[in-house]
Amino acid sequence: MAKTLYEKLFDAHVVYEAENETPLLYIDRHLVHEVTSPQAFNGLRAHGRPVRQPGKTFATMDHNVSTQTKDINACGEMARIQMQELIKNCKEFGVELYDLNHPYQGIVHVMGPEQGVTLPGMTIVCGDSHTATHGAFGALAFGIGTSEVEHVLATQTLKQGRAKTMKIEVQGKAAPGITAKDIVLAIIGKTGSAGGTGHVVEFCGEAIRDLSMEGRMTLCNMAIEMGAKTGLVAPDETTFNYVKGRLHAPKGKDFDDAVAYWKTLQTDEGATFDTVVTLQAEEISPQVTWGTNPGQVISVNDNIPDPASFADPVKRASAEKALAYMGLKPGIPLTEVAIDKVFIGSCTNSRIEDLRAAAEIAKGRKVAPGVQALVVPGSGPVKAQAEAEGLDKIFIEAGFEWRLPGCSMCLAMNNDRLNPGERCASTSNRNFEGRQGRGGRTHLVSPAMAAAAAVTGHFADIRNIK
C-alpha cells in the first residue's frame, strides 16, 4: 500500500500496537532544556529510575538565559533555580549538557541540527512546542509535556495516536527576497491558525525544494502555528549535504548506508492525504502579521483590514479584539506603522543565513532614532561564524545590539522583553497577547524585514530598499 512520509516514519517506530490501544513509539532523540525538565527528573528520582538511554538525550540552556552575560543569576531566582537543577540532573543521570560556558550552548532547536543530533528518519521529542523544527530533515519531531518528558527519560518510548495527513504544496518559484518566513506566514494566512489541527503537514513543491535546510527549519518550526502536530520536508541532497560531517552524524560507510535508507523517506506515488492545500509561490510577497495570532497576516503593502470585511462572525470578533490590543486602526497602510523595538533571533530565525540576510539590509545604515534593535544568534557556533564573517561589526556599527545566544525576546521568560504598549518587529513565531511581555505588541516578519523596520523606524518593503 502506498504510504505518505509521515506514515512511513510512524510505522517504522512502532514498538507495540494492539487493538483499541494507542501505539507505543520508540524515540530516537530526546532534547531537554531547563524549563520543562526539572519535574521530570524529580519523577525519576522519586521512583529510583535511571535515564534509559542517556546517550540519546541531549540538554542545553536556552529559555531563561541572559543574552548579556553568562552569569546564571542574571535573569532572576526562578531562572537560576531551573538552570542549576538542569546542571544537577544532567550530572546525576549522565546526560550531556551544553551549559552557559559550553561553546555549543544555544536554542535547543538550533543546537540539535547543528551538531548532527537531528537526522532524517528519526523520532525526536522535546518539552517544547517548536520541536516541529526538526521535521525539516524528514524526521518525525514534536513537542511533549513534562509528564511525557519523564516517560521518555524512563523508557525511551511514548504512546502516540496516528494523526491525519495534510499536504501543503507551494508551486513555482518564489520571487527574489521572499524567504521561508514569508512562505510559511502566507501558508498560515491561508489555512488559519487552526487549519492544521489534528494533522501532520508535509510541505512540498518547487518553492520548498529550493529552500536551504535553514529555510526548511523556519518552515517546519511554524507548522505548529497552524495547529498541526508537526511539519515535514522529505530529505534530499540538500539534507544529506547539510548533515554530512556534523559531530553526531554517521561517518564513512555508515553515512553512505544511512543516505541509502534516507532516500526511501519519500511519500509514495499514489499515497493519499486527508487534506491538500496549494499555493503559488510567485504570488507571495513580504508578509507582516497585524493581529494576535500568526494567521492574522497580510502583505507589507496592504492596509490594516477592517473587521467588517470578515463574513465569519468569529473571525470578525477576533479581528476587532486584535486591533484593539495592537492599537491599530482599519484601513491605514501597514508601512505607516511605526515600531519601538526589533528582535532578530529565536528558533525560527537565528541561524547564520538569517543573520546574513539582516546584515545585508543593516550594512551602511543606522537604526532609526528611538528604536532598540537586538540581534541574538541562536547558538555559540552561529555567533562564532557570524563574527568570523564580520556580521557583528555590521550590526554594531548600524546601532544594533549584538547579544549572547538564547531564546531572548521570543518569550517573556528572561530579561529581554517588551514594555506595555511597545510595538516590535520580530523574527520569532508567536504574536499572542503578552508573548514578548505584558501589553507588548508583536508583528512577525522575516530577518530582512525586521532589519528594514529597524533602519526606517516603520514597516518597509525590502524590495524597495536599495
Swiss-Prot record:
GO terms for molecular function: 3-isopropylmalate dehydratase activity; 4 iron, 4 sulfur cluster binding; metal ion binding. [4Fe-4S] cluster binds at residues 347, 407, 410. It catalyses: (2R,3S)-3-isopropylmalate = (2S)-2-isopropylmalate. Its cofactor is [4Fe-4S] cluster. Keywords: 4Fe-4S, Amino-acid biosynthesis, Branched-chain amino acid biosynthesis, Iron, Iron-sulfur, Leucine biosynthesis, Lyase, Metal-binding. Binds 1 [4Fe-4S] cluster per subunit. It comes from the Bacteria. Pathway: Amino-acid biosynthesis; L-leucine biosynthesis; L-leucine from 3-methyl-2-oxobutanoate: step 2/4. GO terms for biological process: L-leucine biosynthetic process. It is an enzyme of class 4 (lyase). PROSITE patterns: ACONITASE_1, ACONITASE_2. InterPro entries: 3-IsopropMal_deHydase_lsu, Acnase/IPM_dHydase_lsu_aba_1/3, Acoase/IPM_deHydtase_lsu_aba, Aconitase_4Fe-4S_BS, Aconitase_4Fe-4S_dom, IPM_dehydratase_rel_enz, IPMI_cat. Its EC number is 4.2.1.33. Heterodimer of LeuC and LeuD. Catalyzes the isomerization between 2-isopropylmalate and 3-isopropylmalate, via the formation of 2-isopropylmaleate. Belongs to the aconitase/IPM isomerase family. LeuC type 1 subfamily. This is 3-isopropylmalate dehydratase large subunit. It comes from Shigella sonnei (strain Ss046).
